[in-house]
Amino acid sequence: MIDCAIIGGGPAGLSAGLYATRGGVKNAVLFEKGMPGGQITGSSEIENYPGVKEVVSGLDFMQPWQEQCFRFGLKHEMTAVQRVSKKDSHFVILAEDGKTFEAKSVIIATGGSPKRTGIKGESEYWGKGVSTCATCDGFFYKNKEVAVLGGGDTAVEEAIYLANICKKVYLIHRRDGFRCAPITLEHAKNNDKIEFLTPYVVEEIKGDASGVSSLSIKNTATNEKRELVVPGFFIFVGYDVNNAVLKQEDNSMLCKCDEYGSIVVDFSMKTNVQGLFAAGDIRIFAPKQVVCAASDGATAALSVISYLEHH
């Protein structure tokens, strides 16, 4: 039987694996179908992780994490997990190929995925001017003009954040009304650096080998078209947590989740199910930063070690 099964191979999962193996967990297994690393491997530039002296790609940044974990004995099961369920005092992990595994404890570190828009050019320039993280990438556009797409709290809050860094921020929304908190909207409207473009849609993201250069936008009320010359385009149209592994045969969830599907945990990353932990972007109130996900993974692993000692 597996002592600790870690579902997901991003920064949270790998950190959990490192701390678990170095902490004496003899049989820790990482379940990740492809090479571990997580969605951060798709980033073209990492600059805000402590100790990283030069800008590196997400792929290069995560490679040593994998090597370090495997060096300390973390095992890698290259399969996707379909479902995690509990049977008596242990967990049953069902893989997509029908194979099952049993584990004494489980850390869910499956993360989440920003919703895509399908705008022409989005995939081509993803990570090359198209971003879903102002905290991660805003600094690259210091004193430059950028555009933000979205009408919820996150979009408006990130527009305000970017206004502290950038020369100008265009906030694009397909409707005249916003779904964010009124006080947040008021702060954005009172910021001279933020220009509201409503009701507008983005028809195309344009650029060249160096990245994004402009956006083609259209007013849905008048059909007026404009070209915004911006090197950075931030998309905030929603976020999907990858919690499908929690869904049971009767459609219930293995553990408590909030209204967005994020796993409810305490400060030690414990869920309401004994022996089940969660870390990284899958949990409630996740900051969605690599350094925070790594911290979560370490915390979850330490909690697992304590759990295994007493059970």
Curated annotation (Swiss-Prot):
Listed Gene3D superfamilies: FAD/NAD(P)-binding domain
Alphabetic keyword roster: Cytoplasm, Disulfide bond, FAD, Flavoprotein, NADP, Oxidoreductase, Redox-active center
GO BP of this protein: cell redox homeostasis; removal of superoxide radicals
Reactions this protein catalyses: [thioredoxin]-dithiol + NADP(+) = [thioredoxin]-disulfide + NADPH + H(+)
Binding of FAD, residues: 31-39, 281-290
Keyword Magnesium part of the UniProt annotation: no
Cofactor field: FAD
Cysteine pairings via disulfide bonds: 133-136
Annotated GO MF terms: thioredoxin-disulfide reductase (NADPH) activity
Subcellular locations according to the entry: Cytoplasm
Cofactor binding remark: Binds 1 FAD per subunit.
PROSITE patterns linked to this entry: PYRIDINE_REDOX_2
Keyword Metal-binding: no
Enzyme Commission identifier(s): 1.8.1.9
Subunit structure: Homodimer.
Record family assignment: Belongs to the class-II pyridine nucleotide-disulfide oxidoreductase family.
PANTHER family per record: THIOREDOXIN REDUCTASE 1-RELATED-RELATED
Note: The active site is a redox-active disulfide bond.
Name used for this protein in its record: Thioredoxin reductase
Organism: Helicobacter pylori (strain ATCC 700392 / 26695)
